């Protein structure tokens, strides 16, 4: 089974502040938990993995794609941040439907997928 997430000698600096230093790790498919004390780099690793921030050094691969600039990756990757970011005043239905429309689906496709998605929860 191939590893789905690969960090190769990755470092991230925020100006003079070190976020993570020379991290190399491979994560196989499945459920993985990052555990550590405050300031240990858990959020930085997640932000690097999703492309929200770019590494200062090293290489990252998620499902064979670089998170640096990969629209393909964002079609298959979901990420829930540690803070609420759901827009106020919008329903779950509208949020899913509008997101699908923004990703180029037709109205009929977006409607069908929204219904299917909400039936799962």
Enumerate the predicted regions with their spans:
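Conserved structural motif at the start of ABC-family nucleotide-binding domains
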Residues: 5-7, 20
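Short coil-to-beta microelement around the adenine-binding A-loop and adjacent beta1/P-loop entry
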Residues: 17-18, 71
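ABC nucleotide-binding domain signature
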Residues: 33, 75-82, 97
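The feature captures the beta-strand-to-loop junction immediately N-terminal to the Walker
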Residues: 35-37
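Helix-to-loop junction immediately C-terminal to a conserved catalytic motif
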Residues: 50
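Conserved ABC transporter NBD signature motif
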Residues: 58-73
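Q-loop/switch helix immediately C-terminal to the Walker
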Residues: 83, 89-102
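Conserved ABC ATPase "signature" region
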Residues: 97, 101, 108-121
């Amino acid at each position: 089974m191939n590893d789905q997430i690969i960090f190769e000698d990755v470092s991230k600096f925020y100006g003079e502040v070190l976020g993570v230093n020379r991290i190399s790790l491979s994560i196989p498919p499945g459920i993985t938990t990052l555990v550590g004390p405050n300031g240990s780099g858990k959020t930085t690793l997640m932000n690097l993995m999703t492309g929200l921030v770019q590494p200062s050094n090293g290489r990252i691969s998620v499902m064979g794609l670089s998170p640096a600039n990969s629209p393909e990756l964002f079609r298959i990757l979901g990420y829930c941040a540690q803070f609420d970011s759901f827009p106020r005043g919008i329903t779950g239905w509208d949020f899913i439907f509008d997101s699908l429309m923004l990703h180029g689906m037709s109205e009929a496709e977006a409607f069908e997928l929204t219904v299917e998605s909400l039936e799962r929860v």
